[in-house]
Amino acid sequence: RKINQWILNDDYILLLLSATKESTIYQNYMEQTTTSFAADRDFILDLFTEVIAPNEKLYDYLEDLKLTWVDDIPVVNTFIVKQLTALQSADQKWKLPKVYKDQEDQEYAQELFIKTVLNEKEFAGYFSDKTPNWDVDRIAELDTIILKMAICELLRFPSIPIKVTLNEYLELAKEYSTPKSSIFINGILDNLVKEFQANKKMQKIGRGLL
């Protein structure tokens, strides 16, 4: 979703401009008698991390505009910092990286989403009896989504190694879910992998055998 009519949102641009001008970072930068690409880059980086990213009014605006953006803000901020830090010289032709690494990456994401959604009841059934102390309805919604995606990858993506899948979804749990979610998810997936291997339900080929 893009903001197409900036004239309707210029109050927030002016707000950030005002915050920038009032910041010590900006004032110190403007007092410098000499400059360089490295100094300019560091100024922009400091300005973003100290003035723009923490701005509560901007955060509230983005939250009101689209609620789901709130979960993405930390990831986007980290991405921006990495991109600014990576800039090396003023004459380089810098381009904003694509959403997907390549066509294969895009196809994988789309296939994972479609297969997880179409088979979610089947995947939920695999771990419903692995949580004797928990009613499935009481498991955090994000944990159930992570589990379904992991099971989908284990069973429907034969070329992806088991270890890669386990590590990937444990990291997702640590990053986005509750503090104890990674332990909970690790226990369930570990038992499921053993079960899938025992009944030969999980078939890996090629790189997936690693």
Where do the model's predicted regions map?
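Class I Rossmann-like S-adenosyl-L-methionine
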Residues: 1-210
